Design a protein with these regions (language model features):
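Anionic N-terminal interaction surfaces
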Residues: 1-42, 129-148
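Secondary-structure boundary/capping motif
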Residues: 21, 43-45, 70, 80
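Acidic, Ser/Thr- and proline-rich intrinsically disordered linker/docking segments
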Residues: 50-149
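Phosphoinositide-dependent membrane-docking surfaces
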Residues: 23, 38-59
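A structural detector for beta-sheet-dominated domains
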Residues: 7-8, 16-19, 26-27, 47, ...
C-alpha cells in the first residue's frame, strides 16, 4: 500500500504523507514571492485538520480546456486553505494513488461531487471526467433555501 504521494513538484505541488501524517503544499512560484518572503511551503499536520473538502475547477478556453482537483483544507482553528492537487504533469495513475492515499488517511473527507467514487470507475480522460462532473452538478440545479414572508 502506498503511504505518500507528491502531486506536482517540490517547486509547485502537494505532498500527502500518511507516514508523517502531514500535507505539505509547495508554492515556490516566483522570484517575487521569495523577495517579499511569503511562505514558500505550507505544512499542515493531520492533527490540525478538521476536514477536507474535495473540489474541482474547469476552465473552457477557445483553444483548449483545463481542469483541476483541489482540496479545501479546514483546520481546527477554522482557517481554510485551497490546495491544488492536479498539475500539468499529473497522470491518471497519480490521481488514483492520491484518492487511495487520502481515503486511507482517516481524515474527515467531504466529497460532494463524488470524485473519489466515480473517478476510479471511469474510462474518461481527466478533463472529460471533470466536464461530466460539472454537467451532473448543474443538471441537478441549484437548491435555494425557502423563505417565508
Amino acid at each position: 500500500m502506498i503511504e505518500y504521494i507528491l502531486m506536482g513538484t517540490k517547486k509547485h505541488g502537494c505532498l500527502i504523507d500518511n507516514r508523517k501524517k502531514e500535507i505539505i503544499y509547495y508554492q515556490l512560484l516566483s522570484l517575487y514571492e521569495k523577495i517579499v518572503k511569503e511562505p514558500q511551503q505550507l505544512l499542515i499536520k493531520y492533527s490540525d485538520i478538521k476536514k477536507i473538502k474535495i473540489c474541482y475547477g474547469l476552465t473552457t478556453g477557445a483553444r483548449f480546456d483545463s481542469a483541476q482537483i483541489t482540496m479545501e483544507v479546514l483546520t481546527n482553528n477554522n482557517t481554510s486553505y485551497d490546495i491544488p492537487v492536479t498539475y500539468n504533469s499529473t497522470k491518471n495513475k497519480d490521481i488514483l494513488s492520491f484518492i487511495e492515499i487520502l481515503k486511507s488517511s482517516n481524515l474527515l473527507i467531504e466529497d460532494p461531487y463524488n470524485i473519489f467514487s466515480l473517478y476510479p470507475e471511469t474510462n474518461l480522460d481527466f478533463i472529460d471526467f471533470i466536464k461530466f462532473i460539472n454537467k451532473e452538478h448543474y443538471k441537478k440545479g441549484f437548491e435555494y433555501p425557502q423563505t417565508t414572508g
